[in-house]
Amino acid sequence: MSWMLDKEIKRELPKEWRGVIPTEVFLEEAEKIVKEANARDIQLRILGGLGVAFHSQEFRDFARKLGRVGTGAIEGQEYSDIDLMSYRKHRDKVKELFSDMKYAKRRATLSSAASERQIYYHPKGWFYVDVFFDKLVVANHPINFVGRLELDFPTVTVTDILLEKIQMWEAFSIKDLKDCLILLRTHSIEEKIQKETIDANYVAKLLSEDWGFWFTATTNLKKIKKFIFEIEKLGVEVGLDPRQLKNEEVLQITEKIDKLLERVEKEPKSFKWKMRAKVGTKKRWYNPVERPETVGGFGIWETLLEK
């Protein structure tokens, strides 16, 4: 791997970590990077699971009840990298930012060029940072962030984080399920742009233009609802003790899913959407994303729920 970096990096973890990088380190470093970018007039925002954590700091107990805290690719470690989004116009400035912060840049490959991203490694080899530009292209349904980064800080909006999760068809994971449950438990569904809320209008309008995205997103939401309804039986399968969740928490989540789905269905669909709907699933409706955990299936749903 060293030959792919523009400088040599040696992995040096403090002994007291015992090989596991604390969640707080990821949160602090991500915020540090984004704040430094902001000081340089660079729009740079946190994506994914770390974004969920930033937006649910007051509900870490709920995340622990779900078994989300401390679970990741490395046993006992919650996260393995930092995902960020910026604008294409800032590419050179982003490169300069990470160079000044002593990160090592991974040399461009066909894969990184095609996915419109830059990859940087922590000065002490703790983790890598994935920076995407304008769009999240490495996705079953690419998401456009142009004009969206100014709406929140230090992360993308809660709405966009939820869309990141429910756009997955091939490899929807246990972590993604739990992140969705956290987002839905801790944020209200509103029909307007407002911080710390899920903008049902934006979701509905976006999905009304793309039948494939609509099908994947609504299927995921319905399966999340089915999971939470059958949590007594299915919870153990994902490392979740059903007794940890209160009935009102389950009810809150299901009501929010219903509200979001209702708004999505109410939105008038475009001509393009209607034409694609006639073809349905006879033709592939998502972009395949090749990665180790992707095997062409529907992630955890294949083992948890009946199709």
Regions from the language model: what does each represent?
Residues 90, 127, 176-179:
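Internal, well-ordered alpha-helical segments in soluble enzyme and binding-protein domains
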Residues 31-82, 87-95, 157, 276-289, ...:
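Active-site nucleotide-donor binding segment shared across nucleotidyl transfer reactions
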Residues 95-140:
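Conserved catalytic core of two-metal-ion nucleotidyltransferases
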Residues 23, 81-85, 166-170:
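Short, charged/polar micro-motifs that form catalytic or ligand-binding hotspots
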Residues 6-7, 13, 132-307:
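Catalytic cores of NTP-dependent nucleotidyl/adenyl transfer enzymes across multiple folds
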Residues 81-83, 130, 179:
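Acidic active-site catalytic centers that drive phospho-/nucleotidyl reactions
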Residues 1-40:
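N-terminal regions immediately upstream of nucleotidyltransferase
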